[in-house]
């Protein structure tokens, strides 16, 4: 089997795929944001264990979601702890017995944790969580597309058209962001979807916020339509052009160096490809590590899958000791970027 070699400035790093080595014990990825499972079901744990153990691979089992966003299971506030599995809304009570049950069967549990997502905590008139606290801007409902008036024959039912967002319809966009999510999932290039993301984004520009929740934009308006309506601090996007797009001092956050933008712009905290974070001195501007093979990867950006440690999490939040402990746990267990997903190991 051929193993890929990563070259960088004369150095070589051996990247071993995850499937190349069998772990000493079966692995189970314990998710917190996938499709919810009703109730506390230890019977499912027993069944999953029988499936996971012979294959020596990864499986996914999801606990019940917290009540903040009942249909998606998103966390209500950031969580960063090396010693306990903490979820807002009582998930700890459900998670600990499950982990103990797997440990009793010799199954090593890995939890997929996201700490930089933010969800709305207030319902609108339809009972959907899509209103934001006033302290981050005016709490507003995402606008709907105006109804189209059509000439119709007597007896025909009136057809309505709304913006294709989960917050507007409450049930659409299941393939992109899930049903009833608390952020917009706009698809298309009409007038209303163009105006919706910048308006919503400006009200959530304070970190940590979800700065890149809109996948599958149309390229023709993704760059100019969004970037021209937001500041550099809050720009967002997923489409990349060739070459580096950031240039800053070694201790500063990334800044755009192209005008007009050649691709979808990015937020300093999210949606940045690590290999593009090299400054003029060859180091990452404001981030920890710029070489993916050497970067610490316990934080997962769900939108892009970029492995990174956020600069403000390491210093500004005073979590250096906790992060270093998590890093040491990952190193001892052999968790590295070749796993394909960034996970936290829950210690026994």
Curated annotation (Swiss-Prot):
Coiled-coil stretches, from where to where? Answer: none
| Residues annotated for substrate binding in this entry | 87-88, 182-187, 214, 283, 289-291, 302, 344
Q: Which parts of this chain are annotated as the region Disordered?
A: 126-266
> Which residues pair up as cystines?
none
Which residue windows does the record flag with biased composition (Low complexity)? 161-188, 223-266
Marked site (Transition state stabilizer) residue numbers? 303
Q: Which InterPro entries match?
A: Glycoside_hydrolase_SF
Compositional bias, Polar residues, is annotated for 189-207
* Cofactor(s) listed in the protein's UniProt record: Ca(2+)
Keywords attached to this Swiss-Prot or TrEMBL record, sorted alphabetically, are: Calcium, Carbohydrate metabolism, Glycosidase, Hydrolase, Metal-binding
Subunit text: Monomer.
Its function? Important for breakdown of endosperm starch during germination.
User: What is the protein named?
Assistant: Alpha-amylase isozyme C
């Amino acid at each position: 089997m051929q193993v890929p070699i990563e070259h960088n400035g004369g150095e070589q790093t051996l990247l071993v795929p995850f499937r190349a080595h069998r772990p000493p014990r079966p692995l189970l990825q314990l998710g917190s944001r996938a499709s919810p499972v009703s109730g506390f079901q230890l019977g499912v744990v027993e069944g999953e264990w029988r499936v996971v153990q012979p294959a020596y691979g990864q499986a996914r089992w999801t606990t019940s979601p917290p009540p903040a966003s009942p249909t998606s299971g998103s966390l209500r506030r950031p969580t960063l702890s090396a010693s306990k599995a903490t979820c807002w809304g009582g998930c700890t009570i459900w998670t600990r017995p499950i982990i103990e049950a797997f440990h009793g069967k010799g199954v090593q549990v890995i939890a997929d944790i996201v700490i930089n997502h933010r969800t709305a905590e207030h319902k609108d008139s339809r009972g959907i969580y899509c209103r934001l606290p006033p302290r981050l801007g005016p709490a507003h409902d995402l606008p709907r597309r105006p109804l189209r008036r059509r000439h119709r024959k007597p007896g025909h039912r009136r057809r309505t058209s709304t913006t294709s967002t989960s917050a507007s319809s409450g049930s659409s966009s299941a393939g992109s962001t899930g049903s009833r999510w608390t952020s917009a999932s706009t698809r298309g290039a009409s007038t209303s979807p163009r105006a919706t993301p910048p308006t919503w984004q400006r009200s959530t520009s304070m970190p940590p916020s979800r700065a890149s929740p809109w996948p599958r934009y149309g390229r023709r308006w993704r760059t100019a339509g969004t970037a021209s309506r937001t500041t550099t601090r809050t720009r967002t996007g997923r489409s990349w052009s060739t070459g580096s797009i950031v240039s800053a001092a070694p201790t500063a956050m990334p800044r755009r160096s192209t005008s007009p933008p050649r691709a979808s712009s990015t937020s300093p905290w999210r949606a940045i490809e690590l290999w593009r974070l090299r400054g003029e001195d060859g180091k990452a501007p404001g981030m920890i590590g710029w070489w993916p093979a050497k970067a610490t990867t316990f934080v997962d950006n769900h939108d892009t899958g970029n492995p990174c440690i956020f600069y403000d999490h390491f210093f500004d939040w005073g979590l250096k000791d906790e992060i270093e402990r998590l890093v040491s746990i990952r190193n001892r267990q052999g968790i590295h970027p070749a796993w394909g997903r960034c996970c936290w190991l829950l210690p026994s």
